[in-house]
Design a protein with these regions (language model features):
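Helix-loop element at the rim of GNAT/NAT acetyltransferase active sites that forms part
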Residues: 18-30
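A generic "binding-loop/recognition-motif" signal
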Residues: 11, 64, 107-108
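Conserved active-site alpha-helix within GNAT-family acetyltransferase domains
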Residues: 100, 106-134, 138
Length: 172
């Protein structure tokens, strides 16, 4: 039987292996071991018979928004409910933090629609876009579908940010 629990530092290598298996083909963004160690408290793992068979993280932007990210299960575990249990655990964590909206970006929207997520416009999630997406190599050609569950934030403050002007004019 699959169960979930909060990740701990000794889990990082197995989390890394699961994410790496999906980042090679572009399904997930790659995560370094150092990044995973720094953010291990964001992760939940799925275990079956004492072996980690899946992972997922909840990144908090504030009480108005959190993102489910890096969610994956081993190929042998697909279809056994591990993914659903991971999402449920992450949603409970968001609820514990009183987060009013949980978003995610995915290529499997049907899975998340069955869990109560709805389609979103990228413009509705500026915190995610300005903090993370702008650094992604696929930013201008992103094929992921934005989804949310809860109440889309009406105003987060990010839209009011001014782009800093360069201190010097660079010429080539």
């Amino acid at each position: 039987m699959v169960r979930t629990r909060n990740a701990i530092l000794p889990d990082v290598e197995q989390i890394h292996a699961i994410i790496r298996a999906y980042s090679g083909n572009g399904t997930l963004l790659p995560r370094t071991l150092a990044e995973l160690r720094e953010n291990v408290r964001d992760f939940v793992v799925a275990e079956e018979d004492g072996k980690i068979v899946g992972c997922g993280a909840l990144h908090l932007y504030g009480m108005h928004l959190a993102e489910i990210r890096s969610i994956a299960v081993t190929p042998s575990t697909k279809g056994l409910g591990a993914g659903r249990k991971l999402v449920e655990a992450l949603l409970k964590e968001a609820e514990r933090h009183k987060v009013t909206c949980v978003c995610l970006f995915t290529r499997i929207p049907d899975f998340f629609a069955h869990m109560g997520f709805s389609l979103a416009k990228r413009d509705d999630l500026p915190d995610k876009i300005y903090k993370d997406c702008v650094h992604c190599p696929a930013f201008n050609a992103c094929d992921e579908i934005a989804m949310y569950r809860g109440e889309i934030p009406q105003h987060s403050g990010v839209r009011d940010l001014q782009i800093p002007k360069p201190l010097v004019k660079l010429t080539v």
